[in-house]
């Protein structure tokens, strides 16, 4: 038993090392895009922190979701956060499963490049919307009478840049339209729906996205419009960007080979074009042979001249032979 475990552990370690080597090569090629996506996460947090200084508490707006869903209460606000944390960690672990399991449908680096592209585009639109109009926050710490509803002017730039993480992120106000939690949730769910392999998990993922939407409204963390706008905005963003980005190579066969680089692809394309031109020429000649049009006008003139010369040679030979015959 111990020998079997040791042998399997060795195989697993070799597999992990091989996958790390492959992913590191991809990381060296794509690190700029990944770094830009991570930096924008900080910019998004900084923008949310900045709008908190502009937030002014007021009476809650009339909301259909608030009327339809019972209020969970301040002491149960952790429920929606727990669901979101579960979705986030589950997706994070799944995105690294090619390092361990045989079934590999994607490269982790390329997957996260797409995910960050979806997140950045959605968050950029979100920043524009919540700076365009500041609504009175429905969350408990954003209501009238709360000390955290409005932030005092910052004493220095460093206070703004540090964004009071993580408290400043969890207890922000003013960054409403549209929900950041729903951006992450929908991007993760849509990504798994495309690259995941378990149909049951796909159904459960969409179900959890719906439950997360209802919990956010019931917890009074966002208005219903914030969730509704997130649903169609994020889905449209993912749809358009996904069509613009090059499709990731399929790894269903378990291959650990790197995808073809642009340089290799260009070289291969030139060879394929050269072969294609050759094939086209051969096909044209074949069709000409079938149709009786084997030569062009230049070749025809040359052949006519050759035939004429050949005829003259024959006549000359015959004329020379005639006296000898008589």
UniProtKB/Swiss-Prot annotation:
Taxonomic path: Eukaryota, Viridiplantae, Streptophyta, Embryophyta, Tracheophyta
Any one cellular-component term (Gene Ontology): Golgi membrane
Chief localisation class: Golgi
Catalytic residues identified in the record: 181, 222, 226
Record function comment: Catalyzes the transfer of the phosphorylinositol group from phosphatidylinositol (PI) to phytoceramide, an essential step in sphingolipid biosynthesis. May play an important role in modulating plant programmed cell death (PCD) associated with defense by promoting sphingolipid metabolism and regulating ceramide accumulation.
Compositionally skewed regions (Polar residues) per UniProt: 316-326
InterPro entries linked: Sphingomyelin_synth-like, Sphingomyelin_synth-like_dom
Reported phenotype of the disruption mutant: Reduced plant stature. Spontaneous HR-like cell death (SHL).
Gene: ERH1
Designated name of the protein: Phosphatidylinositol:ceramide inositolphosphotransferase
